[in-house]
Amino acid sequence: ARKSGGDIHLLVAGSNCTAAAQEAATLSGVSTVKVADAAHYQNQTAENLTALIIANAAGYSHILAPATTFGKNLMPRVAALLDVAQISEITGVDSQDTFVRPIYAGNALATVKSADAVKVITVRTTAFDAVNRENTAKIDSIAAAADTAQTTLTNRELTKSERPELGAAKIIVSGGRGLGSGENYHTLLEPLADKLGAALGASRAAVDAGFVPNDYQVGQTGKIVA
C-alpha cells in the first residue's frame, strides 16, 4: 500500500471488533482505521463485506486485500460491481498503476499496467516484508451497510495446531503421493517438522489420497507459501 502512494486507510469490519481496530491502528504507515461494527459482519461473508466496501469506495484509487481464500472470495465481487479489472496476487509494485504478478504457476512474472480509475488488487503477502507496530493511527467509526442476507454460515470447523500457520511459516516440510500412505506421512515428516519448528504441508495428490486434510495443501491449488 505504501508503494502505491497516498494515505493508507485500513478497513476493520466485524462484531465487537474494537480490539482488532486498536491493534490495526499500531501498524506503521496506516493513517486511519475505519471501523464498521455490526452483528452481520461476525461471519465475514463476502456479500456483506462487498456491500460495505462499495458503499465506502468513493475517493479511493486502490483497494487491496490479501490473496488468501478470504481475499479471493471478496475482491472479484468488488471489482465486478465497480466495473474494473481485478489484478490478482501481485508480488511487486513498480508504480501507482503498474504491478508485477506471477503467471504460469509461478514460472514467469508479468508486469501489468492498469488504466482503471480504481485498482482492485489482491496481494501475495509473502512477497512483502511485514511492517512494524510503532504507530497510533486515527480510528473512525463508519456506518454499516445493510445486511444482504444472501448467505448464512451454517458451520465452521477450526483446526488447532501448535505448529506455525502455513501461510506465515518460515519453514515448511511438505510431502506428496510418494509417501504411500497417511501413516507414512505422519511417521516420516512429523519428527522432521518438530526438529525444525516447521509447518506441515502436502501436495494436492496427497490430499486427494486422504493422507491429510485439505488445509495442509500447498501450491497453485492450495495455499501459496512462496
Residues covered by each model-derived region:
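N-terminal glycine-rich FAD/FM-binding segment characteristic of electron-transfer flavoproteins
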Residues: R2-A226
